[in-house]
Amino acid sequence: MKLLFKRYSSSHIGKLIKDSLITPEILPQLGRQPSSHKRLPNNKRTNSITDKWLKDALTRKDKLNEDKLQNVNLRLNVVLTTLQKLRTSDNPALYFALLNRIGTGHIKWLNKSGRQIDAFPPDRLPLEFYHELSNMLYKLSLRSANDKIALAKFSLQLLDRYYFLKTKSLTIEGKFRANIKFLRNCTLLIVKSQSNYYLRAIQRLFAENSEGQLLANLSQLAFYVETSQWTSMLDILSSCVPDSGLRGSKERERAIQLLELFSPCLVKSLKVMIAQNMENEACQILRSLSEWNFHFDQHDSSNLIQLSQNHSCLKVIETMNGLSSTTAVTRQFGLEKLPTDVSLKQSIHILSKDNFEPLKQDSFLQFLSFKLSDLPLNLEVWKKHIKEVDDQMQAESNLHSLRAFFIDMLLCHLSVRKDFDFMLSLVEHIVYEKNLWQPLLLTDNIVGNKENSTFHCLFHGASQDISTKLTLLALYNQLNEIGYQFTSHDFLSMLKVCKNYSDSDFFYFAFYNLLVTQSHKFFLFDKFSDKFSWRLPIQIGDAISEWLSSLEIDIQENTDRVLQITDDVGEWYVENKPFKSEKGTIQPINIMELRKIFGERKTLFHMDSEIFQKSKAKRDKEMRNEALFTANDAEYNFAADVSYAKRVENLFSYIRSKQMQQK
């Protein structure tokens, strides 16, 4: 099983590389260890896994020495393929162990046809290994680890050494061009450090080696995107898509490749422009990219089109349709011809007139929620606005489904833009005063909205406030009683509010219920390795990592416990492969088996308000015994949490009573 959250011990990325990758050819500043130094713990064993891989790469006449590689012929493509598989299977320890082994020997490298590769100084690794290593370092940088500065330093040293070997290579001077994917990887490693100092350093290396202004501009764009400097990003964007007629054929081809490699930054820039209603500017960038024969992949294209529909940027959709062989469906139930300043009430009027049915028709009308942004942070103003829109809907259609659509749009907007108290107050107004509890329940049936309906919005809104642990517990218990279909995002919201050791029992309660209901969705088939694997989603792994890193006591104990749980659950799925034969669906792990994995005496499998308060008091006492106090303790408001939780319980009690009255 591949873990997506880091282990808080001595296995940080920077230390892993320093311990394993002590190869002067790659990192000359670390120096070569004495010959008596045993680099690998298993290098005395002739049957170690690295020995096996190297034997696969040997020519028939060579033999592998158990301690060192001396004067052997290895096939480059076989070793590279092994490294690529280790990278893809997320095994950095063995990856660097193998790279270290080949870097400390005297090897003659052979190409696929068996001829020696001699276009680089003797006893130096071929440049292909630099390209491959940059891919691995970039993959490591995607983790939520505290090693991004270390990776940035490594990438600078790697690039500097790469250019040095380039000048010393036997390739004819002037014809050698650096691998642009390697340059992109090094750039993004630097960018992820968010250090302007390292950015300037890599740009100087590019300038000294005549890599061209476009690469420097794209690296600057990537830096602005990573650091969310949107104004600066917009200023430099046009220079990243220059006049396509100014280049020769080779330079043009290289520029197109660079643009494609940096396409995530370009896509993010376009998304910012669309969100800011910079429609004309976005269209100009799209037209400039088309002159370079640049094409977005289907995923990015779909996301840009949907975002444009959400923000009613119809010119962008038309431009993308003109540049693409496929055409997006842009009809918005009569809204496509409306000016952007049309009010929400006018939009609802058109939807009602066109008999829009959100429970049957899929739509891209989320952009209407942006028309709520102008309302001030005043509860009475919002209540008045809700009344006006609802009165209009009652007069024109009185359809519960259209009112459900309006409520869902309203709460999705509130969950990300207002505090939880404000959001909960409006929900209470909708249920108690407006008597719209039926449309509220219907939001779960809106087409294409299964994972973003009202109650999921409540989970997300509550997770934005640190004083909502008991509130989220109450919300979960109330919905669990009626058999509600939770998503992994609901449990992510519960994990996010865990901020310190006092939250331990609540954390394991949420983690357990996540695995009860969602773990079968994390069991996937890896096409590359041709095997099944089980892994936690990245966001879940990040939330777990954040909680583990915030613990004041028992850090190692909890880290080991979480790792053991995920290991055991993953092993259960991989070993049992619990498929239902009739449909090919995956059977969730047995609850009794999962409880055994968590530990019956260690975990609270049932938790209500009283149990929560007792468990928190117990953990608080353990903290006081250690004389520990954190900023998170001061931020958490228990009284507010109790109040929110009671209001949530009252809401559900009221809705249940209304349902009983109608039976």
Curated annotation (Swiss-Prot):
GO cellular component: cytoplasm; mitochondrial matrix; mitochondrion; ribonucleoprotein complex
GO biological process: Group I intron splicing; mitochondrial mRNA processing
Origin superkingdom: Eukaryota
Coiled coil stretches, renumbered: none
Record-linked Pfam families: MNE1
InterPro entries: MNE1 (IPR025694)
Other observations noted: Present with 861 molecules/cell in log phase SD medium.
Protein name: Protein MNE1
Organism: Saccharomyces cerevisiae (strain ATCC 204508 / S288c) (Baker's yeast)
Gene: MNE1
